[in-house]
Amino acid sequence: MKGQDVILCDGGRHFSYKVLPRVVIVGRPNVGKSTLFNRLLGRRRSITSNTSGVTRDSIEETVILRGFPLRLVDTSGFTVFSEKKASRQHIDTLVLEQTYKSIQCADKILLVLDGTCESAEDEEVIQYLRPYWGKLIAAVNKTEGGEEVHYNYARYGFSTLICVSAEHGRNIDALERAIIQNLFSVDERRELPKDDVVRLAIVGKPNTGKSTLMNYLMRRTVSLVCDRAGTTRDVVTGHVEFKQYKFIIADTAGIRKRQKVYESIEYYSVIRAISILNAVDIVLYIVDARDGFSEQDKKIVSQISKRNLGVIFLLNKWDLLEGSTSLIAKKKRDVRTAFGKMNFVPVVPVSAKTGHGISDALHCVCKIFAQLNTKVETSALNTALKDWVTSYPPPRKYGHVSLKYLVQVSVRPIEFLLFANRPDRIPENYVRFLQNRIREDLGLDSIPVKLTIRKNCRKR
């Protein structure tokens, strides 16, 4: 299999991960690249719109094509940079540079052409791709009406030219066969891993360093970094291996106050950033260490808390502060003040720019993931419950309460079910006491614990 081993270094410690073959989708704006990306992926992942230039970040996903795993990359609309175009916005230049880098790192390049019309830009792009001709597959999109357009593009001498309809799925099977050709050996056919990976999301307000952190972890530019807030639109994913764990990491769009989300495309990006919380185990919540926690931070964290996910607070841009033990202690107190009920959450000072603290953060991730997968025997739970009730019985203000037995019902997230004679008579502060004892006594000190109380039904 093509691909490479990448080594990451932090404070003298090294870890590596295997990179799957990368198939990069390129083409001028609005030819249907994102629609084709979504078609090959089998679900909507890239934002599609009639507006030219919607895709900014190079969106990567692991996909199984005909039994073989690879990384599929959707790039922004591609135009060849020239001095005449030098007046374009800085952000657009960054987008182009990212596309160029994706092409240089590709194992195969999928050039998407518009079957309804040719353009002078197509010829510019084709000439730019000449040095990569051996990796190139040309897909003529929007050919619902037939294959006569095949002959218009045949003059360029593509070794592989396929007419497809990304919208309707026409000829996608043939395209998949062309993509995997010569990328794999037969014994590399496999299914995507499901339960042996840690799913992470990098979440926070705009311009706090989420994309810089993602790029540091991937050791290449997968997310655009710019001083302008709101640069990331899609959810960008990448793979890292640390210790014995495999991570799938998602860099989300910065979540702003609702009244500040103007564009429909940005609105969709924010909705996707929030919805990704339903598909991850742990959230790296990143804030600018120079700032305090705002009301918006509290609202975002409440969305995370509702899902009982593992959380790590990353105090980013620590390199810009006069770091000291007392300052770290103060910042941690600020976190406890802002999120009192989440006093179990680890707080790690980091610099996504220099890599300071990143290894510590990843060690925290491993610890939290192990705790999220903890299974406690029912006998051990009820022995502990008896000790807790003996040391601190339930209040009798609203009548006698008897706690019958405790069982664990799930992992990732951790949830316990407590049976009692009068669940409605157990005050909230006693529920918190039980949750804290579960965390402290059962080795779950860094994760949220959901405790549901149900009425015990007597057998007759």
From Swiss-Prot:
GTP 1 binds at residues 27-34, 74-78, 141-144. Keywords: GTP-binding, Nucleotide-binding, Repeat, Ribosome biogenesis. CDD domains: EngA1, EngA2. GTP 2 binds at residues 204-211, 251-255, 316-319. It holds the Pfam family KH_dom-like. Residues 374-457 form the KH-like domain. InterPro entries: G_ENGA, GTP-bd, GTPase_Der, KH_dom-like, KH_dom-like_a/b, P-loop_NTPase, Small_GTP-bd. One of its GO terms (molecular function) is GTP binding. Residues 21-187, 198-373 form the EngA-type G domain. One of its GO terms (biological process) is ribosome biogenesis. GTPase that plays an essential role in the late steps of ribosome biogenesis. Belongs to the TRAFAC class TrmE-Era-EngA-EngB-Septin-like GTPase superfamily. EngA (Der) GTPase family. Associates with the 50S ribosomal subunit. This is GTPase Der. It comes from Treponema pallidum (strain Nichols).
